[in-house]
């Protein structure tokens, strides 16, 4: 009986190795269901950085300060539209980082995903995946994601906006780690 089981197992293994694996092929996305404008806005609460450096390499974009690093990355064959306009500014203890690009003739024709990482320079084991607060599903793309590592910031917000400038269709994802402290939610007087 044991030999019959071994033979059946051997036949199953060899037949599954000999047969090709089914790998689904995703067809190109039509221009009316694709986007040609990308904007990633990261807002940081309790931040007043003045000096920063920008690095972009192989669909990975970073803004680096003395306290934290923000990274926006895409899948290896991902974003066809490079994020060329990258800037940071701080006002009233809220810092904002903007990664943006728009093209008249380049449309995102394949499935892609954008990920955002906000990491404090001070060593920490705290890791928070930001919660999706609002999201629309207009274009064919994978869901966006973001995480925050550390405790150098009180609140982190990420808004990813995709737009087709010819049709006017807009798709966005809004993520956060919880929100503003009660002092700011309730107003100065409480």
Swiss-Prot record:
The gene is OPG209. It comes from Vaccinia virus (strain Western Reserve). Pfam families: CrmD_SECRET. Transmembrane segments: none annotated. Belongs to the orthopoxvirus OPG209 protein family. This is Protein OPG209. Gene3D superfamilies: 2.60.240.20. The lineage of its organism: Viruses, Varidnaviria, Bamfordvirae, Nucleocytoviricota, Pokkesviricetes. Keywords: Early protein.
